[in-house]
Amino acid sequence: NIVVLVSIVVFGFKDGLKVSALKSTVLMLVTGSVSSFIYSIFGAILSCIMMYIAYRYMSKIFSLIGVSIIGAVSHNFAQVSVASFVMNNFRIFSYLPFLMLIGLFTGYFVGLASIYIIKNLKKNFSEVFER
């Protein structure tokens, strides 16, 4: 998700969404699992949408760490929702609190890494940010 968040910040929503879709497609090709693609693509799309909204419209409230946490939590929620629908079992939502806790930690570190990368991109490739 580092690459997705950096793509959203540097290039915008459409490119972030393309990177998300590409990430899910590569996962499917590597694992050979269509079911992993289904879970991944729904998580990636919701995560990308939520990160964009948080970054674009709530950047005074949320830092990139907060934006990343929103993305991680959204990704987990989407995957659990799809699993619940596919398996026709709402008990799967009982995993959500644990996954949300993990999402807080992973989102925090993804946000930190994204801040570092964007700071270095701005320093070394300032012309990208001048458009």
Task: Show where each model-derived region lies.
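Interfacial aromatic-anchored transmembrane helix boundaries in multi-pass membrane proteins
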Residues: 22-53, 64, 87-91, 96
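Generic transmembrane alpha-helix signature in multi-pass membrane proteins
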Residues: 4-5, 54, 80-87
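Internal alpha-helical transmembrane segments of multi-pass membrane proteins
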Residues: 56-73
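Alpha-helical transmembrane segments and their cytosolic interface
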Residues: 94-131
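Generic transmembrane alpha-helix motif of multi-pass integral membrane proteins
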Residues: 1-15, 50-55
